From Swiss-Prot:
Its main location: cytoplasm. This is 3-deoxy-manno-octulosonate cytidylyltransferase 1. Activates KDO (a required 8-carbon sugar) for incorporation into bacterial lipopolysaccharide in Gram-negative bacteria. Pathway: Nucleotide-sugar biosynthesis; CMP-3-deoxy-D-manno-octulosonate biosynthesis; CMP-3-deoxy-D-manno-octulosonate from 3-deoxy-D-manno-octulosonate and CTP: step 1/1; Bacterial outer membrane biogenesis; lipopolysaccharide biosynthesis. One of its GO terms (cellular component) is cytosol. It catalyses: 3-deoxy-alpha-D-manno-oct-2-ulosonate + CTP = CMP-3-deoxy-beta-D-manno-octulosonate + diphosphate. It is found in: Cytoplasm. Its EC number is 2.7.7.38. Pfam families: CTP_transf_3.
Amino acid sequence: MSFIVIIPARYESSRLLGKPLMDIQGKPMVEWTWMQAKKSGATRVVIATESDRVKAVCESFGAEVCLTSERHESGTERIAEVASLLGLNDDDILVNVQGDEPLLPPDLIHQVAEGLETHPNTLMATLCEPILDVETVFDPHAVKVIRDCNNYALNFTRAPMPWSRDTFGSEPKTLPGNWPYRRHIGLYAYRSGFVKRYVEWPVCALEQVEKLEQLRVLWHGEKILVLDALCEAGVGVDTEQDLIKVRKIMANLNPDGAL
């Protein structure tokens, strides 16, 4: 199977300025993510950034880098520009690995690409994992996904959804026993031709409110396949607290700085 990993790495992050270059065990965060992507079986790994500074750092550790516009609303928009700049074929499978996922298992990158390849009529695929505690359901940084009976997404939201009337209405809140809550893993596979279509659609109101790029796809009536992840996704870095947590994890796993 042939697929290309593209890693959006935005220096001007709204929550953590310079996030791709933040140090973890002597390497910038984006380098750890790139190293994981290189182990996934991808035929090519490209880092996409709007920053000359990020570009220079990434090229220094041997990565292929594509300099993109500063005006993109999302990683998928940045990937569409890369597909155009590199002249990728419409049938090429692209995997969007966010640059703030230094612990993302390579097996999950391969899984989402394979999921798209084995569903030829599907335009976009992603992954999810079980939510085991009620705190995560109420955490706005944990995106919840609801699927239909064929594992296609009905909705993605930061809100506690679905709302359990019986167990969320009083304290202490508990998870209901009759619903499998799922956390979305922000990893996408799509064909190059589809991302070119994606950027032609206007940003939708729901996407703007939730700040979730995948909602544009559902808004325009297309489907997203959501597969159960084969293993735990690891901790991504959205906040300063996440960064502290990841540094502790990697210091314990990698006292010599090697993942």
